[in-house]
Amino acid sequence: MRVKDFTPKLVPTSPGVYLMKDDSGEVLYIGKAKNLRNRITTYFQKQGDSRERIPFLMKKTTTIETILVSNETEALLLENNLIKKHHPKYNVLLKDDKTFFCLAISLTHPWPKIDAIRTKAITSSKRQIIFGPYVSAEACRTLLEVISQWFPLRTCSNREFASRRRPCILYEMKRCLAPCVHLCTHEEYEETLEKAVLFLKGKVSEIIQDLEKSIEKASQEQKFEQAGIYYRTLKLIQQAMEKQHVEKFHFQNIDAIGLYRKYQETVITVLTVRSGKLLGARHFPFSENAQEDTDLLSSFILQYYANQPQTPKEILTPIPLNIPELPYLLNKDTPPQLRSPKTGYGKELLTLAKNNAKVHAETTTQSSSLPYEEMKKILKSPDYPYRIECYDNAHLQGSHGVGVYIVYENDAFSPKSYRTFSISSLAHNDLATFHEVLSRRFSSLTSSLPDMIVIDGGRAQYSQAKKTLKELNLTGIQVVSLAKEASNHSSSLRNEKLFCDTFPQGIQLAPTSKLLQFFQKLRDEAHRFAISKHRRKRYKDLLFPQEKIPGIGEVKRKRLLQKFKSWKQVMKASQGELEAIPGLTKKDIQQLLAKQVEDSKLTED
């Protein structure tokens, strides 16, 4: 169904999934609905949908395709599968991370130790016991450090263990039982290892009871040094429990999901509680998302837990999802409980998750994102510029010229979209260079058109860019040119003039302007990229001069340049100097000497 032909009667009232596509057939957005007619109709009502991205989405949508299903559960599953297939721009899509941070105990060694690992499959076996997954490598390292303080197990490699003849410093620090030199029995070591396993399983109360019994037993047997080790371990665990308020969560496995939106930014944060301990947070920012909160969260949960080897007993969400089938889609054997508590410690966790999401959104927005509100005010830009290209060029006295553009897309630099153009004859003239680069960039539209282009220069460069786009019959692309103030060219906080469609004569922005700083960041990245490509071209031309000499390939050229520093000096080298270069044959030397004679004759002529 084409958007321009839309009438509500054309859409069925059944549950299903709808795909919104642009004029090229690319899927922009995928949604689900209990009643397709009611849902799709809201997109065509002025007050029907208050989400900020909907006007941008509808401007680009030319057709809407529907797929009917039997019920809401089928719609949810189909939506998730189609999102994974099409990767639509306005939906949430997570990267498929198939490795996890875990702790493992290898059972193949007579004196096992605990290691941090990354693995795809989290299943214990006869060869090893695996605990996790944990939110990060740092969480694993922190847990290992705690274990080494509480449970004096070995941490050395198997090779070091086999070669050790006396105990290391960890034994002196009471952080290892020194099984390498048999200063403990197998029974003592296994007892300590069992306590560490209980700790990793979250059975802290059992550890405390065992330690109290061990202290009493060791004291009765007058093993006072061993009793002291047990006592210190007991105190460390009790202190840690007091500091971390472990008892709050009753040793549960819980994930709390926080959601925060601001302008074009959406951040979802997952707080992970395992065995009553808050292990950390993972943040998932989405720059372009047009889903409602319930659709966003259900889609996120399906994708997130599809990549997790285990689901927690409880998943706390900021709003009720009211999808009874969702827990069974996550784990049909032991479905988690999905709830949205309004009081108690569950509410505290949700508040903490939302605050984390808010901080992450605001810090990333301040540091890197586009200041859209200021842009709307100054540039009078009604539409959000999803793709911005910034152009620059570099040359050395007219030689080795390159023109480049970098891409800022979806609120981040996109290095894979950067492009370079070799400029041979026009590098002396910035205006001609910009004209050539823009013409070549837009002559074959193999990549997406930008919403805005930014160039380094003043009014002349701005006018040249506008003229070139007009010649190419390209409309709807904003042009911004940024010029440094001549008298303050080297100042760190410099005044700059901005030339744009609303201010073709230029407007001066304060150095503290977020918009100015954003454009400066784009220009600096384009300049860095241009300089790097220019230097690479100079080096390549130096390494591979236009005159090819038979037998002198890349390896031999590098050896010659390492010795003589430049090709000009190579052409002045004596036969003896050339013979000292490893790898050069007599024929190679004859070719080089002949080339020297040829060049000298050309110089004389």
Swiss-Prot record:
Its main location: cytoplasm. One of its GO terms (biological process) is nucleotide-excision repair. Residues 13-92 form the GIY-YIG domain. It is found in: Cytoplasm. CDD domains: GIY-YIG_UvrC_Cho. The keyword Chloroplast does not apply. One of its GO terms (cellular component) is cytoplasm. Keywords: Cytoplasm, DNA damage, DNA excision, DNA repair, Excision nuclease, SOS response. It comes from the Bacteria. Residues 205-240 form the UVR domain. GO terms for molecular function: DNA binding; excinuclease ABC activity. Pfam families: GIY-YIG (PF01541), HHH_5 (PF14520), UvrC_RNaseH (PF22920), UvrC_RNaseH_dom (PF08459). InterPro entries: GIY-YIG_endonuc (IPR000305), GIY-YIG_endonuc_sf (IPR035901), GIY-YIG_UvrC_Cho (IPR047296), RuvA_2-like (IPR010994), UVR_dom (IPR001943), UVR_dom_sf (IPR036876), UvrABC_protein_C (IPR050066), UvrC (IPR004791). SUPFAM superfamilies: C-terminal UvrC-binding domain of UvrB, GIY-YIG endonuclease, RuvA domain 2-like. Belongs to the UvrC family. The UvrABC repair system catalyzes the recognition and processing of DNA lesions. UvrC both incises the 5' and 3' sides of the lesion. The N-terminal half is responsible for the 3' incision and the C-terminal half is responsible for the 5' incision. Interacts with UvrB in an incision complex. This is UvrABC system protein C. The lineage of its organism: Bacteria, Pseudomonadati, Chlamydiota, Chlamydiia, Chlamydiales.
